[in-house]
Amino acid sequence: MKIISQQRIKSLGISPKRCVEWIRESFAMKAQAQLPAKISVHPADTDFFTSMPCLLPNPADTGVNFHRQYFGVKEVHRIEGAVPSLGSDLMLYDAKSGELLALMDSDWITTMRTGAVAAVSAKALRKTGAETYAFVGLGNTARASLLCILEAEPEKHFKVKLLRYKKQAELFIQRFEAYSNVEFEIMDNIDDMAKSADVLISCITSATGQLVSDEALLPGITVIPVHMRGFQNCDTTFDRVLGDDTDHVKGFKYFSQFKAFNEIGEVLAGNDPGRTSDQQRIIDYNYGLALHDVTFAAKIFEMLESDASIQSVEMIKETANTSAFVTRASCVTVVVLR
């Protein structure tokens, strides 16, 4: 078993553009993957552990260039008072042999696949000529989203508006100083920002009520609430609601009142036109799929599989055919870095 840390993953220099390509590739596999619903337990109050399993399809059936069929399960946790409070790890298996191949720190994977999904969804659903993107919540997820947006379309110039919060907007702009295809404006009022946006991406992790008035969400806007918070008012008024998985949103309070719903993967596959008018208001809920996590993990594992410098752990298994313990070598690579 290989132990793969975040530091080692980052050292691979995986570009945001490649992350976008992996997201498109993984969405194309969704119909053939086994993707059970997430399971969560709650030790106390807002603390949680969430398990996210996924069996990728046999590569022979998809044309994806994997060396083997993979199963993986990501464990996400949030513990109040822990440092960091939010983290995730992923176990990757050979689906044919049951061998545990790797234990990975999956914080980088989670951030970048989330950003790539937002970028892909925004491009697929935005109106004709859209160029103004607005962001609220300017942490790592927002940065990953904009990195993927800019690098996936280097020929396109973007106007990006940021909601002011402490010094986060200024620091956010500094991160993108090297990019020539973007200009920034900092705004103080979220409704004013929304009115001027073609695409509104929210990366806040908590909200006690609606963030933006319905009147500020003008015809043609695309809203992507990355962490699902603050836009419940859109559920009954918007022309279309998209999601990464039906099971993720069918429990929403107003699901039965959606005017039109489908999965974003159907849009990416060309089975659904997505936006049919530049006047439509569209919201896309991407709750997060283990499909993406396991695809990223498999790609990373195959990039590192032959790297002898990575820490490996030998697993000792007891066989049913003998009373003695027999060594069954299980090369697992685990990379852990917070």
Tell me what each language-model feature is:
Residues 10, 230, 234-323:
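Adenosine-phosphate binding glycine-rich loop
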Residues 149-153, 176, 215-216, 304:
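Active-site catalytic pocket residues across diverse enzymes, especially alpha/beta-hydrolases
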Residues 1-111, 119, 126-129, 262, ...:
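N-terminal ligand-binding/catalytic initiation module
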